[in-house]
Structure formats: C-alpha cells, structure tokens
C-alpha cells in the first residue's frame, strides 16, 4: 500500500476514440470496448515442494478507466473535476456513468508473459498514462483470495529500473472477492472491471465507493491535476509484502479494527487523505521493516548483499503461535534468494531493538526507539493482521509515484527536518530533494518493474521449487536436489530431499514440532530452532 496520495493518473481529453478519459471507479458498464483480462500464471506448492500451476488473470483498477455518460460518450470526470450535469450528487453520478474495457499494453503499459507481469511507469499512446494498479483474478468475475496464515508467499521481482521516488508495490488488501458486486446494488461492474479497492489509508481519492460516486465534498488536488479527495473513503486491512525501488524496500502489516472493506466519512477516515491521520479505524503507519531504517545501510541496493541490479526472489513467511492455519499470527519473517543463495534478512542494529523479523514485541520496541505513535498495537497488532489473513486477501501489484511526500518515507529522510543519525529518520540514501513526480515523469518515463514466479504454500515449500515460467496448461515442478545457501557470510552446498523427506531439512524450512514427520536435521551451518511447540525452523 500506499501511504501517500496515489498518483496513478491518466491525462485525458474529450475525444471518444482516445478511450482514455478521467481516472475513475465506475459502477455501470459501457459497450465501447470489451474487457479482456491478460493471463498470468502462478503456483500453489505442497509441503514436499511440488508446485501446481494456476491459470490466473489480472485486471486493472477501475480508477484508471474511461468513464462516460451511459447514453453517449461525454466524460463524467475530466482533469480533477466532475461533470456537474452528469454528477450533481453521488447517486445520480453512479446512475449516469458507465465504465469501459481497457487496452492494457497500449494504454497502461501493463503486459504479461507466462507467470510475469511488467508495469511501465509512463505510457504514451494517444494520451499519457502514469503508473497502474492491478489485481490477481480467480476468474473473469472474481478476485483470487489468499489465506496466508502458516504459509509462505514467494515471488521474483526486478527493481533495477526503479529510481528514487518510485514504488513498485506488491501487497494484499481485504477487498470483496467480487469487487462489491453483491453487497452494493449500485455496483454493476464488479471485479471484472476492477472495482472495490480499499486499504489502510482509507483512500478518499476513489471516485466511486460502495456503488456510489464520491462527488459530494470533492476537493480537487492542488498538486495533481488529475486527482482529488471526496467526502468518503474506503477502509480495510493491508499487508504490504513489498514496497520498493532500487534503493530501499520495506514490508509492513497494517491492521484495522475490522478487516473487511467499509466506507468511512470525511476526516474521520484518518490516513494520508485526512487532516487527522490517526482518527480512523485502521493503522496508517503499520509496523515496517526497512533494512536501511533498521541500521544496515549496505544490505539492500545496487551491488549490495541483496543486489538490486539483478532479479531476486522474495520470501515472506506468516508464522502462527501453534503452527496451524487456525492459529494466531505471531511473526512475519523475510528472506531472499539470489544467485542460488538464501540470504537471511538483515538484523536491526539499534540498541533495544534487535531482530530481523516482525513480532508484537519488535513492533512495540520499534515505536519506542523511533518515537512513533503505536497505532499498530492500537488496531490489533499481529492478531489484527492475522484476522485479515485468515479471512483471505486480494493480491495487488502496482507502480506509482507520490504527490504527497515524494516517497521520502521509503527511500530518504523522513521527516526531512530530522537528523539522519536519529533512530528511524533515515530510510534510504536518496536525497531529500528527490522523488518529485514531475521530475520522475520527465526524466524517468521508461522506469518499470517486473513481478513473476508467484508461489504460495506451506513454510519451506516455495523458494526451492524451481523458477519456471509456465504457459497456460497446468504443470508441476519439483525442488532441485541440491542448493547453494547463504547464512550471513557463510556459504554451504548441501543435498536435500525437501522438508518432508527423509534427508536434511532445507534452510529456513520446518524441522520439528507437534505433528511434524519430516527431517529434523538441518543443512550446515543451520540449526533447528524451536519457535513454539508446533513449529521449529532451520535458522
């Protein structure tokens, strides 16, 4: 997610054939262009490392689409202003406006190939498009929902072409699987057209929420000619797996008092879009792990331990207190695989703030050491985030720039008035003058990010199960019989049969616990470490 004003925009005119008009979230469906979802394969893995391909699809958020009069082709929204005749109020606007299909490659710079999705920053066709936000689909009318408790989520990413100020974000939100189609009678478009977005910032820049327009109370943005804030926002829990460019990265859980999507009113929404940031029902800050912010300035970046000049595999594990999918979320772990080596997440170097994973204790200590308000605990902490993961969340893949704070919260000093030696201020090596969207759009229009090779499965099942890019048919891949692993600066080559075989347990795989029947010996130099009675892991 996106902790600042989302800057996905389309520059529009009034010509029908351009098919690139105001970026809005419509609820009715037009007939000018058929909606065809690009295919994107992903995999589910079993405990033995065998993975099965799912034939998924992606859909672009409705906020990017052309929306026009249902009886013609007049824009409902142009620049950052509503058409007063078509949209005098929320209900009339929803009734009068229709949403069209998308030309993914030519208009939005979004292309797929096998299991890969490539997003381009600036796409110039008849008009100019900035960034994009897409969702994984189960079928043409339904978002895929992922339940990640006691699971790990793995994907490959190439951020080599993302400079300071850009954010290639892959994350989960508690959207309705049908995009709100069944809950809200005013919504006739649904997930097929990318409706129903929500996140922990309770965004108010959405043009339609819960089947109604957001025109009442709409204030055009003073910095973004194509955006504004309405009287309502759309709230839900958010799990940021990956927010990154080539300089910095962070992963961040954001719980809400109630995980699912709900509409909020005005400044009581809280978050980036409201005057009272902490006045809502969600945690806008979250509890983040950014290696640079935690004190290790040589871990992630060009030529560093995790080398952003190369594609990498990112593994995120969601551990529970009892080692089951019905347990309580207790820890979120991160590690990387690059050049055949497993790389442990960096350790925090600040006094009284040790560790390399997220737990309730770590998050409380971080808020104290960094002097931040502990809204993470206020809104449920790990337990609150776990409630959302248990219900199932929708996968979001995006690329954006930041009109609110130039992405300095990710890759530079924030606040800019702070001293870089003060704990928590420095988040990356980018200059505080970097990240201006106008500069990025002018000087880095060809910036891009590629997400690929998505896998989900039991702990230890996904990161050593091959890196194929399958086509449309269902296939399976088995883990390699050998792997080169790295823990800190030590490298070892070991043979393994996978976590439930009779040989040696893989690095970071399960190696013990109640009900576990796999190998209990870890590959050197790893040690089987008890996490709880139900789960031990090779660390």
From Swiss-Prot:
The gene is cbhB. The biological conversion of cellulose to glucose generally requires three types of hydrolytic enzymes: (1) Endoglucanases which cut internal beta-1,4-glucosidic bonds; (2) Exocellobiohydrolases that cut the disaccharide cellobiose from the non-reducing end of the cellulose polymer chain; (3) Beta-1,4-glucosidases which hydrolyze the cellobiose and other short cello-oligosaccharides to glucose. Keywords: Carbohydrate metabolism, Cellulose degradation, Disulfide bond, Glycoprotein, Glycosidase, Hydrolase, Polysaccharide degradation, Secreted, Signal. GO terms for molecular function: cellulose 1,4-beta-cellobiosidase activity; cellulose binding. Belongs to the glycosyl hydrolase 7 (cellulase C) family. It is found in: Secreted. This is Probable 1,4-beta-D-glucan cellobiohydrolase B. SMART domains: fCBD (SM00236). Residues 503-539 form the CBM1 domain. Residues 1-26 form the signal peptide. It holds the Pfam family CBM_1. It is an enzyme of class 3 (hydrolase). GO terms for biological process: cellulose catabolic process. Residues 462-504 are annotated as: Disordered. Its main location: secreted. Residues 27-461 are annotated as: Catalytic. Its EC number is 3.2.1.91. It comes from the Eukaryota. SUPFAM superfamilies: Cellulose-binding domain, Concanavalin A-like lectins/glucanases. It catalyses: Hydrolysis of (1->4)-beta-D-glucosidic linkages in cellulose and cellotetraose, releasing cellobiose from the non-reducing ends of the chains. The active site is at 238 (nucleophile), 243 (proton donor). One of its GO terms (cellular component) is extracellular region. Glycans are attached at residues 90, 296, 495. Residues 462-503 have a biased composition (Low complexity). Residues 462-503 are annotated as: Thr-rich linker.
């Amino acid at each position: 997610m996106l902790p600042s004003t989302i800057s996905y925009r389309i520059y529009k005119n009034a010509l029908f054939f351009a098919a690139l008009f105001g970026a809005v979230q419509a609820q009715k469906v037009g007939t000018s262009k058929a909606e065809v979802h690009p295919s994107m394969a992903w995999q589910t893995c079993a405990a033995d490392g065998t993975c099965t391909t799912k034939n998924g699809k992606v859909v672009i958020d409705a906020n990017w689409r052309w929306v026009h009069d249902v009886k013609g082709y007049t824009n409902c929204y142009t620049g950052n202003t509503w058409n007063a005749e078509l949209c005098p109020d929320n209900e009339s606007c929803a009734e009068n406006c229709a949403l069209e299909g998308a030309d993914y490659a030519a208009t939005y710079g979004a292309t797929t190939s096998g299991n890969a999705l490539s997003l381009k920053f600036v796409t110039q066709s008849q008009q100019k498009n900035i960034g994009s936000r897409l969702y994984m689909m189960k079928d043409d009318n339904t978002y895929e929902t992922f339940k990640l408790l006691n699971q790990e989520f793995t994907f490959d990413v190439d951020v080599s072409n993302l400079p300071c100020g850009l954010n290639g974000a892959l994350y989960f939100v508690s959207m309705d699987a049908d995009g709100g189609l069944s809950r809200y009678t005013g919504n006739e478009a649904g997930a097929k057209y990318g409706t129903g977005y929500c996140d922990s910032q309770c965004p108010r820049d959405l043009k339609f929420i819960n089947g109604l327009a957001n025109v009442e109370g709409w204030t055009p943005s003073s910095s973004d000619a194509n955006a504004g804030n309405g009287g309502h926002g759309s709230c839900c829990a958010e799990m940021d797996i990956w927010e990154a460019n080539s300089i910095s990265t962070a992963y961040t859980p954001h719980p809400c008092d109630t995980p699912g999507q709900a509409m909020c009113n005005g400044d009581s929404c809280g978050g980036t879009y409201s005057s009272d940031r902490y006045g809502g029902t969600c945690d806008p800050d979250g509890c983040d792990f950014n290696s640079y912010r935690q004190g290790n300035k040589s871990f992630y970046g060009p030529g560093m331990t995790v080398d952003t000049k190369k594609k990498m595999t990112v593994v995120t594990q969601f551990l529970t207190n009892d080692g089951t999918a019905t347990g309580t979320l207790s820890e979120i772990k991160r590690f990387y695989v690059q050049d055949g080596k497993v790389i442990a997440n960096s350790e925090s170097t600040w006094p009284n703030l040790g560790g390399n994973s997220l737990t309730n204790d770590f998050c409380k200590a971080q808020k104290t050491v960094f002097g931040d308000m502990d809204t993470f605990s206020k809104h449920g902490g790990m337990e609150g985030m776990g409630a959302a993961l248990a219900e199932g969340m929708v996968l979001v893949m995006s690329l954006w720039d930041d009109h609110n704070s130039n992405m300095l919260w990710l890759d530079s000093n924030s606040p800019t008035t702070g001293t870089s030696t003060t704990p928590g201020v420095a988040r990356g090596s980018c200059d505080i003058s970097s990240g201006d969207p106008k500069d990025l759009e002018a000087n880095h229009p060809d910036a891009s990010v590629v997400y690929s090779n998505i896998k989900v499965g039991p702990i230890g099942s996904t990161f050593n199960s091959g890196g194929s890019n399958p086509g449309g048919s269902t296939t399976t891949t088995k883990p390699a019989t050998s792997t080169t692993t790295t823990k800190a600066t030590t490298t070892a080559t070991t043979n393994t049969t996978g976590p439930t075989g009779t040989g040696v347990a893989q690095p970071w795989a399960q190696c013990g616990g109640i009900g576990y029947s796999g190998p209990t010996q870890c590959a050197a130099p790893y040690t089987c470490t008890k996490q709880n009675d139900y789960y031990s892991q090779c660390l």
